[in-house]
Design a protein with these regions (language model features):
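Positively charged n-region of N-terminal signal peptides that target proteins for export
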Residues: 1-5, 23
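Sec-dependent N-terminal signal peptides
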Residues: 4-12
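C-terminal motif of bacterial Sec signal peptides marking the signal peptidase cleavage site
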Residues: 17-20
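N-terminal, intrinsically disordered, polar/charged segments of Gram-positive cell-envelope systems
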Residues: 25-66
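Short beta-strand/loop segment at the start of cytosolic alpha/beta domains
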Residues: 54-84
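Structural signature of tandem-repeat unit edges
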Residues: 68-76, 86-103, 114-127, 135-150, ...
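Consensus positions within tandem repeat domains that build extended binding/scaffold surfaces
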Residues: 108-109, 130-132, 152-155, 175-178, ...
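A structural signal for leucine-rich repeat
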Residues: 201-205
Length: 235
């Protein structure tokens, strides 16, 4: 079977469920990891650099991470991210690479990062594969973008500094044990558009039992959260 046909079959399987073949494991990245000192002006005209303190208020204002630090491959009409070698405190994924949109984070694509405190995904990303952020132990904040449709199993497994997650309107599917070992998470916002969410999306035995599930009344997320005995706040 030639490489082009194999890649096409793999993409079909990934779309069908984010399991099995899916995006393959990221290639070993031999790029030397360095930090940049780029500066981005915020709305308050204060400079945010990669040396700034990372807060809930400013993490989305950090400079975009240079594409040279990413391992990526073509997938469908754009690119999937398979790895990142940046040691900056914030990984701000670019919207496009080589003129094509970044549309997926592959399996373990941004996992095992020991320095990252926040991740910003562009609005072009539709798919986050399983274990995408696993063991990002210092990750506190994440922005998922407005086009996300599904997130795979164990995506935030071991992210024991993660404070909250807001899934965007239009999101459809949440995988198994997405928040395993997320010990300090305060709240998870889940829109009514999410209709596929398993009873074990949140593993209460190893997570914060006082987490708030913020979701509209009558939603699938409310039903599942109630079955797990989690606190529900209707929004």
């Amino acid at each position: 079977m030639n490489k082009r046909l194999l890649t096409g079959l793999c993409a079909v399987v990934m779309l069908s469920g984010l399991v099995g073949c899916g995006p393959k494991e990221p290639k070993q990245d031999t790029t030397t990891s360095t930090s940049t000192n780029e500066t981005k002006e915020t709305e308050n005209n204060t400079a945010t650099t990669n040396n700034s303190e990372v807060t809930e208020k400013n993490f989305k204002d950090f400079p975009e991470t240079d594409e040279k630090y990413f391992t990526y491959e073509e997938w469908q009409e754009g690119y999937a991210i398979y790895g990142c070698s940046s040691e900056d405190k914030v990984i701000n994924v670019p919207k496009t690479i080589n003129g094509k949109p970044v549309i997926a984070i592959a399996e373990r694509g941004l996992a095992n990062n020991q320095t990252c405190e926040a991740i910003v995904l562009p609005d072009t990303v539709r798919v986050i594969s399983k274990s995408a952020f696993t063991l990002d132990v210092n990750l506190k904040f994440i922005h998922l973008g407005s086009s996300l449709e599904r997130i795979g199993d164990n995506a935030f497994n071991g992210c024991n500094s993660l404070e909250f997650v807001k899934f965007p309107e239009g999101m459809q599917e949440i995988g198994i044990n997405v928040f395993a070992n997320a010990k300090v998470i305060k709240y998870i916002e889940i829109p009514a558009s999410v209709t596929e969410i398993p009873d074990v999306f949140y593993f209460t035995a190893s997570n914060n039992p006082d987490v708030e599930i913020r979701t509209p009344k009558g939603s699938k997320a409310e039903e599942v959260a109630n079955s797990l005995g989690l606190k529900v706040v209707n929004n």
